[in-house]
Amino acid sequence: MLQLLKSSWVRSAGSGVVTWRASAGLFCPGTRQASDTSDTLHHPSPSSESQVQPVRVCSMMHLPLQSSPEGLDAAFVGVPLDTGTSNRPGARFGPRRIREESLMLGTVNPSTGALPFQSLRVADLGNVNVNLYNLQDSCRLIREAYQNILATGCIPLTLGGDHTITYPILQAVAKEHGPVGLVHVGAHSNTSDKPLEDKVYHRTPFRRSVDEGLLDSKRVVQIGIRGSSRTLDPYRYSRSQGFRVVLAEDCWMKSLVPLMAEIRQQMGGVPLYISFAIDALDPAYAPGTGTPEIAGLTPSQALEIIRGCQGLNVVGCDLVEVSPPYDLSGNTALLAANLLFEMLCALPKVTTV
């Protein structure tokens, strides 16, 4: 299902030196290969160990690497696909860069009191082996991979990848849970039909999801939408389906805590999927993306949105549209890594103090 670089740590007797040994593979993931579902997976992030940061090989938050979701409550999964991009490419490199920027993340969330690693079994499952030459085949591969993950009860947290990937993920999620609620945070509504004569690309995932009955349309909220358009009412389709559309200008200079209180009430206990495109944020904070739009959300508002989902029945999350070639400082990927950690902290069963 997932193509991984099989690896192991070897410690020389009495030397204290840890040697990285790897066999052939397609993806260079993280620290240690977790081959069983023992209590060792109930752990703080390995970033708490005594090794200095540059010594370790990169996985999300230095989590153990597993080739199977069996026994996990949640897992980080990379989908390095950008062949659905309409403007600037590069999101295929997003998972790798986000993992790199996650290495300094801690194990608890002092702001919310969340203790994810004391509550859940979590690992990094590596990357889905997409087909960069065939978008339709990539969608099939993603859908099948996520069906296997979800069938075990594991909640996937996805590192994208362009927003096309949300469509096959939602196909798998809906097969497991039925139509789901959606909190979509992004600059674009992504409800186009086929403006480029193709029904599947990063501007169409939620249109296709409605077509296939994957969403509970009365429980879909889109936040941060903005930008110029070729029509005066570019959000007509979303609103006609019952989506709540919260424009970026309605968020300017405001706390979004009251908005999220309304959304929590709207969602109730239904299964909820969170899809966060990094272009929701103003490009002053997140320049490394394929289709930036000015006057976006702030990082603190992004935190309010994700933290506002804590306690809801979250069944999956993604963070998409990070394009490292346009992220010279690494700040965009750093934001993405932190937002994924916040998503982990917002999952069901995560205890707080």
Curated annotation (Swiss-Prot):
The modification N6-succinyllysine is found at residue 218. The modification N6-acetyllysine is found at residues 194, 218. It is found in: Mitochondrion. It is an enzyme of class 3 (hydrolase). Gene3D superfamilies: Ureohydrolase domain (3.40.800.10). GO terms for molecular function: agmatinase activity; arginase activity; guanidinobutyrase activity; guanidinopropionase activity; metal ion binding. Residues 1-33 form a transit peptide. Pathway: Nitrogen metabolism; urea cycle; L-ornithine and urea from L-arginine: step 1/1. GO terms for cellular component: mitochondrion. It catalyses: 3-guanidinopropanoate + H2O = urea + beta-alanine; 4-guanidinobutanoate + H2O = urea + 4-aminobutanoate; taurocyamine + H2O = urea + taurine; L-arginine + H2O = urea + L-ornithine. Keywords: Acetylation, Arginine metabolism, Hydrolase, Manganese, Metal-binding, Mitochondrion, Transit peptide. Mn(2+) 1 binds at residue 163. Its EC number is 3.5.3.-, 3.5.3.1, 3.5.3.7, 3.5.3.17. GO terms for biological process: putrescine biosynthetic process from arginine, via agmatine; urea cycle. Its main location: mitochondrion. Residues 29-52 are annotated as: Disordered. Mn(2+) 2 binds at residues 188, 279. InterPro entries: Agmatinase-rel (IPR005925), Ureohydrolase (IPR006035), Ureohydrolase_dom_sf (IPR023696). Pfam families: Arginase (PF00491). Its cofactor is Mn(2+). It comes from the Eukaryota. Hydrolyzes linear guanidino acids to form urea and the corresponding amines. Displays specificity for substrates having a negatively charged head group and short chains including taurocyamine, guanidino propanoic and butanoic acids. May protect cells by detoxifying potentially harmful amounts of guanidino acids. Metabolizes L-arginine with low efficiency. Belongs to the arginase family. Agmatinase subfamily. PANTHER family: ARGINASE/AGMATINASE (PTHR11358), GUANIDINO ACID HYDROLASE, MITOCHONDRIAL (PTHR11358:SF26). This is Guanidino acid hydrolase, mitochondrial. The gene is Agmat.
